[in-house]
From Swiss-Prot:
Catalyzes the transfer of a phosphate group to glutamate to form L-glutamate 5-phosphate. Gene3D superfamilies: Acetylglutamate kinase-like (3.40.1160.10), PUA domain (2.30.130.10). Pathway: Amino-acid biosynthesis; L-proline biosynthesis; L-glutamate 5-semialdehyde from L-glutamate: step 1/2. InterPro entries: AceGlu_kinase-like_sf, Asp/Glu/Uridylate_kinase, G5K_ProB, Glu/AcGlu_kinase, Glu_5kinase, Glu_5kinase/COase_Synthase, Glutamate_5-kinase_CS, PUA. This is Glutamate 5-kinase. Residues 280-358 form the PUA domain. One of its GO terms (cellular component) is cytosol. It is an enzyme of class 2 (transferase).
Length: 376
């Protein structure tokens, strides 16, 4: 299969490769260092061809199952975190040993959703990853499961890999798992499931039924599709391919499903506002303000706000909602929640001079379509 979108992945200089838990385990569920070594070999070939590669690797919890004498993946949070603590050591040591065969050094980068959502930590993570690449080390990124709470079910690193792809300015993202691409329904349950080789946008997914997670990983098809749409909307093409064909996927992108990127890449700040930052509150707008913000790309003024919810400070990211409560945009708010509550519905001329700035400036606004809102 050849297409301009596959060619973009085949020729990408900067690449993020996400390796799922099921790609690193045996059929019985035990961590398999041999499988990891095979994936490292495929990545090494791509790097020898001139690409810079960052690896987002799941598998810490699975790698901790056997050393702790567990018979299966734990279900309670404390045991998951204990398994991740033990397994992360084995995981990064395996990557280190695999790349040492090629004279390469690896660096471990553990992140949480909170790290990505906070602007300072977000920037520091970006600098660290950039520096590792400049020093020719292979960055191995994983979610820090030992301190994560709800994030431990973040999607088997699918969403994290999409965020990292934009964070490092990657030219493409490759999601490797135990599936060979996207189908209109689960091919394991439906004999006539139709393979979807290319997705140009969310509209192509109307009617597609995504499967649930595997027994070892936490990232089902819905998680992978959501991550792929996130990256593609931010300007990064994505290949969803089977880990068993990693060598082919990384060599010529001729397998799996490709998600076409939007023509213009989001700026780092707009991407952070749109996808990475945690919204700490919400503003409900009247219909006129929704039109101004979404269609005309204008700044939000206090007169168009009908309600304020949440506890936030100036500089935080908030959701902008239509009268029916549907999110229509996200943006950086200029005022504290308590201050803004006194401004609701008032025209600029009614406000004192220090409160006449836009509530959310157009430069700090990112509109969100109904389909996109489901990906946040």
């Amino acid at each position: 299969m050849r297409s301009p979108h596959r060619d973009a992945i085949r020729t990408a200089r900067g690449l993020v490769v996400k390796v799922g838990t099921t790609a690193l385990t045996t059929p019985s569920g035990m961590f398999d260092a041999g499988r990891l070594a095979g994936l490292a070999e495929a990545v090494e070939r791509r790097m020898k061809a001139g690409s810079d590669v960052v690896i987002v690797s799941s598998g810490a919890i699975a790698a901790g199952i056997e050393p702790l004498g567990l018979s299966r993946r734990p279900k309670d949070l404390a045991t998951k975190q204990a398994a991740a603590s033990v397994g992360q050591v084995a995981l990064v040591n395996s990557w280190s040993a695999a790349f040492a065969r090629y004279g390469r050094t690896v660096g471990q980068v553990l992140l949480t959703a909170h790290d990505i959502s906070m602007r300072v930590q977000h920037t520091n993570a970006q600098r660290t990853l950039d520096r590792l690449r400049a020093l020719h080390a292979v960055a191995i990124v994983n979610e820090n499961d030992t301190v994560a709470t709800n994030e431990i079910r973040f999607g088997d690193n699918d969403r994290l890999s999409a965020l990292v792809a934009h964070l490092v300015g990657a030219d493409a993202l490759v999601l490797l798992s135990d599936i060979d691409g996207l189908y209109d329904c689960d091919p394991r349950k439906t004999a006539d499931a139709t393979f979807i080789p290319e997705v140009s946008g969310p509209a192509d997914l109307d009617g597609v039924v995504a499967g649930r997670s595997s027994h070892l990983g936490t990232g089902g098809m819905a998680s992978k599709v959501s991550a792929a749409l996130l990256a593609a909307d931010a300007g990064v093409p994505v290949l969803l391919a089977p880990a068993a064909d990693a060598a082919t996927a990384l060599a010529d992108a001729s397998v799996g499903t490709v998600f076409a990127a939007r023509p213009a890449r989001l700026s780092a700040r707009r991407f952070w506002v749109r996808y990475a930052a945690e919204a700490t509150g919400a503003l409900t707008l009247d219909a006129g303000a929704v039109r101004a913000v979404v269609r005309q790309r204008r700044s939000l003024l206090a007169a168009g706000i009908t309600a304020v919810s949440g506890r936030f400070c100036g500089g935080d990211v908030v959701e902008l909602r239509a009268p029916d409560a549907a999110m229509v945009a996200r943006g950086v708010v200029a005022y504290d929640a308590s201050e803004l509550a006194t401004m609701v519905g008032r025209s600029t001329s009614e406000l004192p001079g220090e409160l006449r700035r836009p509530v959310v400036h157009a430069d700090d606004l990112v509109a969100v379509s109904a389909k996109q809102a489901k990906q946040v």
